[in-house]
Amino acid sequence: MDWRVGEITAFSAAYNKAIECLARGPKSTKDLTRWLHQREHAREDVEATIERLTERGLLNDAQYAEIFARTRATTRGMSRRRIAAELAKRGVARELADAAIAEVMSDENIDERAIVEAAAAKKFRSFAKLDADVQRRRLYGFLARKGFAPDLVRETVQRLTRP
C-alpha cells in the first residue's frame, strides 16, 4: 500500500485507539471493527488496523472465543447454546465458537446437567410461595432463556417441582 503522510497519521490514530481498546479486554474482530467505525475512522484505516493487529497476534477470534466461553461457562453458568449464540452475535465463526466451547467444557470438566441443576435450585428458592403451576412455568422459562436444551429443562423442572 502506498502511504502518504496524512494517511499514515489517520492509520496511526486508528491503530492506537484499537490498542487502547484491546488493553481494556479482548475483543472479536467484528466488535473491534464496529468500535473503530463508531469513532469515525475511515474504512481503509480500520481494515489496515485489523489486518496489522491480526498479523501481530493481538487480535485473534479463536483466542477470544476461548476466553469468552471459559468466563461465561465457569462464572455465569451459561449453556453451550447460549455461549454459541453470544459468540455468533459478536461475529465469531461458528467453527471457532464450537471448538472453543468444546475445549472449555472438557478442560474445566463442566457438566451442563450440573449447571442447569444449580441454576434451577437457586432460582427455585425464590418461587417458594407461588402455586406449583406458576413455579413450573417460571422455572422452565428461566432455564430456557439461559439456553439449556428443552429436554434437560423439562427433566430438571419435573424433578424439582415433584410433590
Where do the language-model regions lie?
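An alpha-helical, amphipathic repeat domain used for nucleic-acid recognition
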Residues: 1-163
